[in-house]
């Protein structure tokens, strides 16, 4: 009853998305809140410890930006979100032609993109606050803090956009929830491998930092354009 009341102010795809998110809040929001608490408390605690002991552990945490690429990869909502969308909504709705029209696809995509970013932001935002507070307590350079904050925002945008966009462009799931698209599997493997490699790099040079940010932003723009052209043809059920 509460679900219907809170979603009743919305209509169309926004209503459908609101009902989906409410009915699956245990799957999504409980996980996000759990990570959010850890993400905020841990850096603040390290900042306090660093200030009291003189051991600047926060500098060791903030400095190696590469490891954060892997951390955000681990905690972000990725396939668990798109698979839930397919199993609970799209597997049934894709039978209808009106649901696969370009306008309908774009509407549902941007509504879901907002939800994806909000869920990932629910983890990243407390982390950013925790890092800023912990960093200031332990006198970490402002430049180092800002570089990490920008990277965290970029990564949050990337993981929110990439998996949802690939889902719409490729729709990789069969009715049995198995992945049938080799391109989808290869792209996910590449991202995992890249994150793993970056974790080994203790100090990311500025040129690489800027390159990563630029590539992510360009990728998002290109993926939006490709999704608009391809999704009406590819966003369908697979046998």
What are these regions (language model features)?
Residues 1-95, 104-239:
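Hydrophobic alpha-helical transmembrane segments of membrane proteins
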Residues 100-101:
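Catalytic domains of carbohydrate-active enzymes that cleave complex glycans
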């Amino acid at each position: 009853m509460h679900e219907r009341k809170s979603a009743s102010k919305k209509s169309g795809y926004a209503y459908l998305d609101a009902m989906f998110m409410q009915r699956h809040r245990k799957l999504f929001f409980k996980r996000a809140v759990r990570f959010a608490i850890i993400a905020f408390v841990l850096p603040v605690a390290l900042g306090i410890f660093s200030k009291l002991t003189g051991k600047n552990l926060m500098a060791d945490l903030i400095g190696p930006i590469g490891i954060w690429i892997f951390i955000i990869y681990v905690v972000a909502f990725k396939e668990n979100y798109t698979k839930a969308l397919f199993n609970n909504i799209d597997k049934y709705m894709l039978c209808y032609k009106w649901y696969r029209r370009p306008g309908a696809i774009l509407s549902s995509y941007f509504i879901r993109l907002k939800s994806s970013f909000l869920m990932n932001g629910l983890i990243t935002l407390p982390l950013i606050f925790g890092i800023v507070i912990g960093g200031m307590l332990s006198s970490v350079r402002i430049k180092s803090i800002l570089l990490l904050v920008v990277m965290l925002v970029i990564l949050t945008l990337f993981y929110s956009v990439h998996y949802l966009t690939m889902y719409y462009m490729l729709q990789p799931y069969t009715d049995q929830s198995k992945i049938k698209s080799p391109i989808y599997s290869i792209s996910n493997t590449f991202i995992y491998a890249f994150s793993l490699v970056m974790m080994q790099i203790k100090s990311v040079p500025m040129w690489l930092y800027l390159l990563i940010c630029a590539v992510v932003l360009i990728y998002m723009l290109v993926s939006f354009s490709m999704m608009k052209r391809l999704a009406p043809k590819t966003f369908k059920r697979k046998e």
